[in-house]
Amino acid sequence: MSRFDNVAVTKQANVYFDGKCVSHTVEFADGTKKSVGVILPSTLTFNTGAPEVMETVAGACRVKLAGENEWKSYAAGQSFEVPANSSFEIEVAAEPYHYVCHFG
């Protein structure tokens, strides 16, 4: 799916890591929320409250989940899961990484 229909979008962006990650919150009619964003080339660490599924829309990244030793690579069309109350490192190298973060 390349678009979301019948949603509310928060106008003001969520800006993290001095602008290296920028996203917008999208709320669906059933109350569920997702964020749609871009990470510029960098290596960042994110903490999670709720479980997350990170869907790769464009670009590529490498990810290391908390407690793991190895990095795993993801490209457009792939996703990875992060448990609640955890963290992950993400490395974006060549071009911006476009994603949808599915919460819960």
UniProtKB/Swiss-Prot annotation:
Its EC number is 2.4.2.1, 2.4.2.2. One of its GO terms (molecular function) is purine-nucleoside phosphorylase activity. Coiled coil: none annotated. GO terms for cellular component: cytosol. Keywords: Glycosyltransferase, Transferase. It catalyses: a purine D-ribonucleoside + phosphate = a purine nucleobase + alpha-D-ribose 1-phosphate; adenosine + phosphate = alpha-D-ribose 1-phosphate + adenine; cytidine + phosphate = cytosine + alpha-D-ribose 1-phosphate; guanosine + phosphate = alpha-D-ribose 1-phosphate + guanine. PANTHER family: PYRIMIDINE/PURINE NUCLEOSIDE PHOSPHORYLASE (PTHR36540), PYRIMIDINE_PURINE NUCLEOSIDE PHOSPHORYLASE (PTHR36540:SF1). Catalyzes the phosphorolysis of diverse nucleosides, yielding D-ribose 1-phosphate and the respective free bases. Can use uridine, adenosine, guanosine, cytidine, thymidine, inosine and xanthosine as substrates. Also catalyzes the reverse reactions. This is Pyrimidine/purine nucleoside phosphorylase. The gene is ppnP.
